[in-house]
From Swiss-Prot:
InterPro entries: 6-PGluconate_DH-like_C_sf (IPR008927), NAD(P)-bd_dom_sf (IPR036291), UDP-Glc/GDP-Man (IPR017476), UDP-Glc/GDP-Man_DH_C (IPR014027), UDP-Glc/GDP-Man_DH_C_sf (IPR036220), UDP-Glc/GDP-Man_DH_dimer (IPR014026), UDP-Glc/GDP-Man_DH_N (IPR001732), UDP_ManNAc/GlcNAc_DH (IPR028359). Belongs to the UDP-glucose/GDP-mannose dehydrogenase family. It comes from Pseudomonas aeruginosa. It comes from the Bacteria. This is UDP-N-acetyl-D-glucosamine 6-dehydrogenase. PANTHER family: UDP-N-ACETYL-D-MANNOSAMINE DEHYDROGENASE (PTHR43491:SF2). Activity is relatively constant over a wide temperature range from 37 to 56 degrees Celsius. Optimum temperature is between 37 and 42 degrees Celsius. Dehydrogenase required for the biosynthesis of the B-band O antigen of serotype O6 lipopolysaccharide. Is also required for flagellin glycosylation. Catalyzes the conversion of UDP-N-acetylglucosamine (UDP-GlcNAc) to UDP-N-acetylglucosaminuronic acid (UDP-GlcNAcA). Can also catalyze the conversion of UDP-N-acetyl-galactosamine (UDP-GalNAc) to UDP-N-acetylgalactosaminuronic acid (UDP-GalNAcA), with low efficiency. Can use NAD(+) or NADP(+), with a preference for NAD(+). NAD(+) binds at V14, D32, R37, T83, T118, R329. Disruption phenotype: Deletion of the gene causes deficiency in B-band O antigen biosynthesis. Mutant shows a defect in flagellin glycosylation. Optimum pH is 8.5. The gene is wbpO. Requires either potassium or ammonium-containing salts for activity.
C-alpha cells in the first residue's frame, strides 16, 4: 500500500476533492487536459468552489499536470471524467474512452485503473478495459487490473463531503477488490462497502440517481394535479411528511450531471438486452417537460391579469442546476428560457453564482449584472440561491412592474408572498 502512487484523471467537481483528500495522505498527481484548469489549481484557485485555497495547501503531496508523461510514475489511476448523454439522449462515453486511451499509453504491469464515472453495468469491463488493453498492449487481470468505485459528490454541499459519504468499492479480482477498498478507507471516514463485483457497483450507482429521478417525477406529477385542484403542493407535502416513512421530495426542475442523465444509461443498457423500461422513461419524460409546464402556467397567469404576453419582459432568477453552486451542466432552467422565447418574451437571466463567460459558452446566454427595478412583467424564482432568499419578497417584487406575476418554483417565499408556486 505504501508504494501506491495515485493519479486522478479529470479534475472537475468529482476529481479535485478526491485528489485533495488523497493528497493529504500520499503522493498524488492530478491530471486534466484543460491547461487553464491546471494553471488555476497551481495558483490555489478552484473555480468550481468545491475546494478552497486552504484545503489545496493542506494537500501537500498533490501536484497538478496536463502532461501525460507525468503519470508514468503512478501505478493507480482513478478516472473521474464526465459521462454525459448526446442530443439523442444516448450515453456518450467519449470522455471515458479518451481517458482510457491516455492511461493505456502509460499503463505498466501491475497497475490498477479505478473508474468513478457513472456508467451502465458492464461499461468498465466491456467498454473501458478493451481500450486499456489496446493502447497498453497488456492483458487484463494478468498484467493490469481494474476497479470501480462510483462517485457520490453533491456539488455545492459543504456538509456531505468526499470523506463523509460512504463509498462503494469493487475490483476485478478478490485481491484487487480488497486493495481498492483499503485505499479508499484511508480517506473515507464514513466507511466503505465492498461490492461483490464491478457490475454490482456500477448498477448500484446508476439506480441511486434513477430512484431519485422517479421520486421527483412522482412529486412533479402530483404538483400538476394539485395545481389544477387549487391545492398548495407544499402544504400537502408538509402534512404527508408528518408520517415517519414519507419521503421528503419536492417538485422542480431535474437537471445537473447526474439525476437527469444517469437513468438514460440504464435504459440504454436495458434496451440493448431486449427490455424496454416503462417507468424509468415515463419519469424522464415528465421531468423533462417541467420547463414547458412552468412557462404555460406563467403565461396563463399573465393573461388573467391582462398582461400582454407578446414582447413581455420576464426575469429568470437563477441559471445553475442547483442552489449555491456555479455548476451549469445540464441545467433545466435553460428549458424555461427557450420556452419563453417561443412566446416572443424577452428574458433576462440573473444569477450571481454564474460566470458570464460560461453561460455564453454553454448556452448562448448573457446574464444581467443587476436587474432593473420596475421592468418586468413576470419574475420566476428558478434556483434557491441564498442571495435570493435573503432579498425577501418585497425587494424581489420591486423588480416587477406595477402589474406583474411572481412565480416561486422553489418555495423560497411564504405561500401568500408569490402569485404562483409549483
Amino acid at each position: 500500500m505504501k508504494d501506491l502512487k495515485v493519479a486522478v484523471v479529470g479534475l472537475g467537481y468529482v476529481g479535485l476533492p478526491l485528489a485533495v483528500e488523497f493528497g493529504k495522505k500520499r503522493t498524488v498527481v492530478g491530471f486534466d487536459i484543460n491547461q487553464g484548469r491546471i494553471a488555476e489549481l497551481r495558483q490555489g484557485i478552484d473555480s468550481t468552489l468545491e475546494v478552497d485555497a486552504a484545503e489545496l495547501k493542506e494537500a501537500s503531496e498533490l501536484s497538478f499536470t496536463f502532461n501525460l508523461q507525468d503519470l508514468q510514475k503512478c501505478n493507480v489511476f482513478i478516472v473521474t471524467v464526465p459521462t454525459p448523454i448526446d442530443e439523442h439522449k444516448q450515453p456518450d462515453l467519449t470522455p471515458l474512452v479518451k481517458a482510457s486511451e491516455s492511461i493505456g499509453k502509460v499503463l505498466k504491469k501491475g497497475d490498477i485503473v479505478i473508474y468513478e464515472s457513472t456508467v451502465y453495468p458492464g461499461a468498465t469491463e466491456e467498454d473501458c478495459v478493451p481500450v486499456l488493453e489496446k493502447f497498453s498492449g497488456l492483458r487484463f487481470n494478468e498484467d493490469f487490473f481494474a476497479g470501480y468505485s462510483p462517485e457520490r459528490i453533491n456539488p455545492g454541499d459543504k456538509e456531505h463531503r468526499v470523506s463523509s459519504i460512504k463509498k462503494v468499492t469493487s475490483g476485478s479480482t478478490p485481491e484487487i477488490a480488497e486493495l481498492v477498498d483499503s485505499l479508499y478507507r484511508e480517506i473515507i471516514t464514513a466507511g466503505t462497502h465492498k461490492a461483490s463485483s464491478i457490475k454490482v457497483a456500477e448498477a448500484a450507482k446508476v439506480i441511486e440517481n434513477t430512484q431519485r429521478d422517479l421520486n421527483i417525477a412522482l412529486i412533479n406529477e402530483l404538483a400538476i394535479i394539485f395545481n389544477r385542484m387549487g391545492i398548495d403542493t407544499e402544504a400537502v407535502l408538509k402534512a404527508a411528511g408528518t408520517k415517519w416513512n414519507f419521503m421528503p421530495f419536492r417538485p422542480g426542475l431535474v437537471g445537473g450531471h447526474c439525476i437527469g442523465v444517469d437513468p438514460y444509461y440504464l435504459t440504454h443498457k436495458a434496451q440493448s438486452i431486449g427490455y424496454h423500461p416503462e417507468i424509468i422513461l415515463a419519469g424522464r419524460r415528465l421531468n423533462d417537460g417541467m420547463g414547458a409546464y412552468v412557462v404555460s402556467q406563467l403565461v396563463k397567469a399573465m393573461l388573467k391579469r391582462r398582461i400582454h404576453v407578446d414582447g413581455a419582459r420576464v426575469l429568470l432568477m437563477g441559471l445553475t442546476f442547483k442552489e449555491n453552486c456555479p455548476d451549469l451542466r445540464n441545467t433545466k432552467v435553460v428549458d424555461i428560457v427557450r420556452e419563453l422565447a417561443e412566446y416572443n418574451i424577452q428574458v433576462d437571466v440573473f444569477d450571481p453564482w454564474v460566470s458570464a463567460e460560461d453561460a455564453m459558452h454553454e448556452y448562448g446566454i448573457t446574464p444581467v449584472g443587476t436587474p432593473s427595478h420596475g421592468a418586468y412583467d413576470g419574475i420566476i424564482l428558478a434556483v434557491a440561491h441564498s442571495e435570493f432568499k435573503n432579498m425577501g419578497a418585497e425587494n424581489i417584487r420591486k423588480l416587477g412592474k406595477a402589474e406583474h406575476v411572481l412565480y416561486d418554483l422553489k418555495y423560497l417565499l411564504d405561500e401568500d408572498k408569490s402569485d404562483l408556486r409549483l
